């Protein structure tokens, strides 16, 4: 519906029989009223056309093809505002076939039927209003032995049961003696005067309720129970507490019905709405076989049983009352199965032992109508996959699997193939994409270079839950992500999934580049703290990367249990020499040796370092001093080494480190230099 502010909205609730009739009934130009479905048939087996007054009737729901009636006549639909014309022979209007998506029908039930959601769902709204046990109400509705029960009619005329209520004593067997009269002659007159059974009794009692009186009486009782002192009996006190909770729920329910202008008797159905045909289709599959929605079969079951009950009530006056009650029970069960199959019981199955999919199954759950097609629609140009860590990625890049990328950018690839005259039409281009020719990957790379993508992880609780990235192709089926951006998404690499979206318009791409790229969202929008900080895996990696030489040369020299060579073998104290650890002139040589697998990531090494006044001015005493024949000597400290000439001048300085330390230092140095260049560039622009 559309409210006064032109906001589209959907409201779910109870409606009156008059409203159901207004939705489903329509008046043809010849003043004929149609809308009631009376036949349980769908299509004629010979003509393959919808049966008249059946579940797919074109008179009720509209034509299957726009402007074509059931006779095959055709009329041009010029203006929908004009009065629609119809075929006088078959009674089908010449309107658009899309009317079959929203035009409803109805089934006029031969007996009232309780809505199973309001009777059997817990808490039961009907039991709450009537303040009666649910088992007693079920016995009244379904007439099941031995839980069979009946109610007094609401009529004010004197009855035997009303007179019986004046006596002080009770006959315990009266409840079981009444069913003996079901097969006696004249039972109908007795039943109509003395007792009321089935959903009709529920409807009478609900219609006789005054909601404001219920609120007043419930509040008075709740207040009275609240003023009573505890009895000391745990069972009695708990019973009083449950009664008070029940009264609160009853008052809230009555207030809700008053606020929404809903009458309690609407929970008992007299007219059963029939869904539009397009929402419960019959589809022809390969081999000429028909595949139908389960709801059609459930509707057919309701119509069959309802027509049988109608015949029993109208044509056969001598029908036993017990047979009528059994048929009413069958109608009630058929409607229950249609609305919610298997609620608090065994579900109904077809001939292949498959459970029928009822109306509740269609709308509820993750794959239901609301969550799949209304609330969480599937979006074009989008995909979903598991995320894994991409340690070699830049902060603003993400790895997109080839299988996902070729589907998301398929239209762009087709355009590229046609522009480069590699395909004559769309069909040829799609065949090349299916065959995954080498030129496809080249064009895909060109397309992805200038096209950002959006990654989203549900739930999106703040604006950093969706960020833009520059995609690159990767092997496998998982999306590769830089670990620093995980905190903004509140994601980790334990099986989390992310959705991929392709911004199509120029405005969306501009917004993604200028506002949503991950390297532009380094601070939390809420408190301003850095949000791209190392966590979890990165902290462990940094620890392993820098854990090689924490204890210095002293530990390696005087504690042989802590010294191991590259083959993970313990070095004997007598054979250990610092000269056995490799020397490198610069960091590039050390990294090259690591890439050639001559040293490990945590293997200690000596790296030539620039002269540092902090090292020279240090008062630390050397661990050892080694003299050479030319007069030079080596001063060995815990973490560094100084080579001096005969004049005690410093020639070289070496620091004891690992390849992991070198990697970390280079990254930090490059980051500082980049930040410095950015600051200097900003100052230049401001000048």
Swiss-Prot record:
DNA-dependent RNA polymerase catalyzes the transcription of DNA into RNA using the four ribonucleoside triphosphates as substrates. This is DNA-directed RNA polymerase subunit beta'. The gene is rpoC1. HAMAP family: RNApol_bact_RpoC1 (MF_01323). In plastids the minimal PEP RNA polymerase catalytic core is composed of four subunits: alpha, beta, beta', and beta''. When a (nuclear-encoded) sigma factor is associated with the core the holoenzyme is formed, which can initiate transcription. InterPro entries: DNA-dir_RpoC_beta_prime, RNA_pol_asu, RNA_pol_N, RNA_pol_Rpb1_1, RNA_pol_Rpb1_3_sf, RNA_pol_Rpb1_clamp_domain, RNApol_RpoC1. Its cofactor is Mg(2+); Zn(2+). It comes from Silene latifolia. Its EC number is 2.7.7.6. PANTHER family: DNA-DIRECTED RNA POLYMERASE, DNA-DIRECTED RNA POLYMERASE SUBUNIT BETA. Keywords: Chloroplast, DNA-directed RNA polymerase, Magnesium, Metal-binding, Nucleotidyltransferase, Plastid, Transcription, Transferase, Zinc. One of its GO terms (cellular component) is mitochondrion. One of its GO terms (biological process) is DNA-templated transcription. Binds 1 Mg(2+) ion per subunit. Binds 1 Zn(2+) ion per subunit.
């Amino acid at each position: 519906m559309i409210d006064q502010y032109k906001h589209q909205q959907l409201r779910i609730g109870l409606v009156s029989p008059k409203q159901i009739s207004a939705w489903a009934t329509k008046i043809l130009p010849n003043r004929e009223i149609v809308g009631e479905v009376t036949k349980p048939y769908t299509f004629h087996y010979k003509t393959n056309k919808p049966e008249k007054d059946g579940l797919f009737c074109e008179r009720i729901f509209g034509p299957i093809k726009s402007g074509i009636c059931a006779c095959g006549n055709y009329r041009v639909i010029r203006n929908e505002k004009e009065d629609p014309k119809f075929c006088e022979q078959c009674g089908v209007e010449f309107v658009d076939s899309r009317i079959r998506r929203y035009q409803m029908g109805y089934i006029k039930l031969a007996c009232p039927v309780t809505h199973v959601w309001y009777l059997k769902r817990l808490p039961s709204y009907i039991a709450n209003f009537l303040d009666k046990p649910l088992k007693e109400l079920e016995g009244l509705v379904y007439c099941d032995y031995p839980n069979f029960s009946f109610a007094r009619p609401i009529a004010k005329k004197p009855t035997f049961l009303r007179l019986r209520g004046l006596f002080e004593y009770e006959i315990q067997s009266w409840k079981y003696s009444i069913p003996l009269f079901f097969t006696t002659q004249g039972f109908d007159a007795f039943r109509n005067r003395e007792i009321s059974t089935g959903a009709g009794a529920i409807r009478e009692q609900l219609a006789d309720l005054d909601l404001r009186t219920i609120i007043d009486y419930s509040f008075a009782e709740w207040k009275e129970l609240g003023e009573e002192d505890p009895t000391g009996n745990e069972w009695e006190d708990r019973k009083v507490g449950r009664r008070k909770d029940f009264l609160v729920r009853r008052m809230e329910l009555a207030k809700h019905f008053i606020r929404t202008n809903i009458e309690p008797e609407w929970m008992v159905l007299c007219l059963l709405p029939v869904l539009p045909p397009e929402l419960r289709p019959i589809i022809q599959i390969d081999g000429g076989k028909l595949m139908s929605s389960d709801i059609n079969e459930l509707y057919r079951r309701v119509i069959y049983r309802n027509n049988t009950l109608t015949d029993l009530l109208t044509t056969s006056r001598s029908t036993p009352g017990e047979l009528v009650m059994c048929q009413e029970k069958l109608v009630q069960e058929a409607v229950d199965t249609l609305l919610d199959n298997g609620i608090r019981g065994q579900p109904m199955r077809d001939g292949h032992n498959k459970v029928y999919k009822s109306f509740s199954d269609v709308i509820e759950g993750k794959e239901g109508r609301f969550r799949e097609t209304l609330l969480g629609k599937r979006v074009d140009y989008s995909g979903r996959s598991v995320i894994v860590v991409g340690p070699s990625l830049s902060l603003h890049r993400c790895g997109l699997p080839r299988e996902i990328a070729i589907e998301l950018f398929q239209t762009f690839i087709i355009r590229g193939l046609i522009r480069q005259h590699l395909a004559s039409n769309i069909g040829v281009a799609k065949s090349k994409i299916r065959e995954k020719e080498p030129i496809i990957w080249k064009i895909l790379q060109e397309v992805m270079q200038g096209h950002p993508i959006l990654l989203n992880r549900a739930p999106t609780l703040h604006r950093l839950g969706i960020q833009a990235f520059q995609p690159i192709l990767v092997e496998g089926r998982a999306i590769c992500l830089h670990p620093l951006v995980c905190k903004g998404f509140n994601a980790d690499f334990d099986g989390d999934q992310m959705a991929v979206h392709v911004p199509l318009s120029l405005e969306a791409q501009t917004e993604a580049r200028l506002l949503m790229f991950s390297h532009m969202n380094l601070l939390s929008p809420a408190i301003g703290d850095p949000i791209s900080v190392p966590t979890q895996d990165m902290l462990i990696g940094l620890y392993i990367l820098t854990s090689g030489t924490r204890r210095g040369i002293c530990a390696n020299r005087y504690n042989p249990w802590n010294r191991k060579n590259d083959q993970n073998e313990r070095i004997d104290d007598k054979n250990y020499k610092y000269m056995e650890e490799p020397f490198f002139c610069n960091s590039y040589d050390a990294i090259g040796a690591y890439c050639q697998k001559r040293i490990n990531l945590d293997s200690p090494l000596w790296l030539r370092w620039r002269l540092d006044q902090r090292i020279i001015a240090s008062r630390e005493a050397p661990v050892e001093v080694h003299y050479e024949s030319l007069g030079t000597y080596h001063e060995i400290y815990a973490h560094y080494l100084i080579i001096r000439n005969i004049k005690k001048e410093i020639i070289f300085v070496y620091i004891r480190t690992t390849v992991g330390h070198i990697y970390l230092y280079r990254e930090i140095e490059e980051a500082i230099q980049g930040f410095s260049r950015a600051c200097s560039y900003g100052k230049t622009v401001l000048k």
